[in-house]
Amino acid sequence: MNQIDRLLTIMQRLRDPENGCPWDKEQTFATIAPYTLEETYEVLDAIAREDFDDLRGELGDLLFQVVFYAQMAQEEGRFDSVSYTHLTLPT
C-alpha cells in the first residue's frame, strides 16, 4: 500500500458511519472550509519564511484536507477516490 492509499484508508475509517470519529463524521464541505483556508495560509507562510521543513508538514496537512473533501464527495456519489487524482493539465 502506498502512502496515498494509506491516507485514503485512514480517511475512510475516520468517516465510517458506525465506527468513525464523531467529529470527522459530522463535518461537511462548509464546515471544513475554514480549516482548508487556515492550512493554505500556513503553506503560504512557510513559503514566505523559506522554511521548507515546515512547508513539508503544511503540505501534508493541506493534502489531508483534499482527501477529506474527496471522501465526502465519494460518500455523496459525486466522484470516486480515483477520479480526483486524475489531474487535467494545461496543454
Q: Each PLM stretch: what is its role?
A:
Residues 85-91:
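Conserved small/polar residues in nucleotide/adenosyl-binding loops
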Residues 4, 68, 79-81:
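Aromatic-residue hotspot detector
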Residues 47-48, 72-79:
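Short alpha-helix-to-loop micro-motif enriched in aromatics/charged/Gly
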Residues 1-55:
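Extended low-complexity intrinsically disordered regions
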Residues 60-64:
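Glycine-centered tight-turn and secondary-structure capping sites
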Residues 65-72:
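Alpha-helical scaffold segments in carbohydrate-active enzymes
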Residues 53-57, 79-82:
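Short, solvent-exposed positions on alpha-helices
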